[in-house]
Each structure stands twice: as C-alpha cells, then as structure tokens.
Amino acid sequence: EGECGGFWWKCGSGKPACCPKYVCSPKWGLCNFPMP
C-alpha cells in the first residue's frame, strides 16, 4: 500500500508507520520530526 503517517498523524499500535522523515513520538503518540 505504501501508506505512511504524515506530520502529526496518530501512530503506534494499529496505526500506519510514520513516513520516513518522521518518527513516532512516544510522548504524544504522533508522527513528528526526529528530536536530537
């Protein structure tokens, strides 16, 4: 399918993985830019 989570999409259990340029933020459960 190639569907991925965009900026601020819900991520985690049962959700699509975040798009490559984002990571799933455990604090918010949303796709966000990687934090250093």
From Swiss-Prot:
Molecular function per GO: ion channel inhibitor activity; potassium channel regulator activity; toxin activity
Main location: secreted
Disulfide cysteine pairs (residue numbers): C4-C19, C11-C24, C18-C31
GO cellular component: extracellular region
Keywords recorded for this protein, A-Z: Disulfide bond, Ion channel impairing toxin, Knottin, Neurotoxin, Potassium channel impairing toxin, Secreted, Toxin, Voltage-gated potassium channel impairing toxin
UniProt-annotated location(s): Secreted
Entry superkingdom: Eukaryota
SUPFAM superfamilies per UniProt: omega toxin-like (SSF57059)
Role according to the record: Gating modifier of Kv2.1/KCNB1 (IC(50)=5.1 nM), Kv2.2/KCNB2 and Kv4.3/KCND3 channels (IC(50)=39 nM). Acts by shifting the channel activation to more depolarized potentials by stabilizing the resting conformation of the voltage sensor. It completely inhibits opening of the Kv2.1/KCNB1 channel at negative membrane voltages and dramatically shifts channel activation to positive voltages. May act by partitioning into lipid membranes and then by binding the voltage sensor paddle of the channel from a place within the membrane.
Recorded family membership: Belongs to the neurotoxin 10 (Hwtx-1) family. 44 (Jztx-4) subfamily.
Miscellaneous remark of the record: Negative results: has no significant effects on Kv1.2/KCNA2, Kv1.3/KCNA3, Kv1.5/KCNA5, Kv3.2/KCNC2, Cav1.2/CACNA1C, Cav2.2/CACNA1B, Nav1.5/SCN5A, Nav1.7/SCN9A or Nav1.8/SCN10A channels.
Record's comment describing the protein's domains: The presence of a 'disulfide through disulfide knot' structurally defines this protein as a knottin.
Protein name, per record: Kappa-theraphotoxin-Pg1a
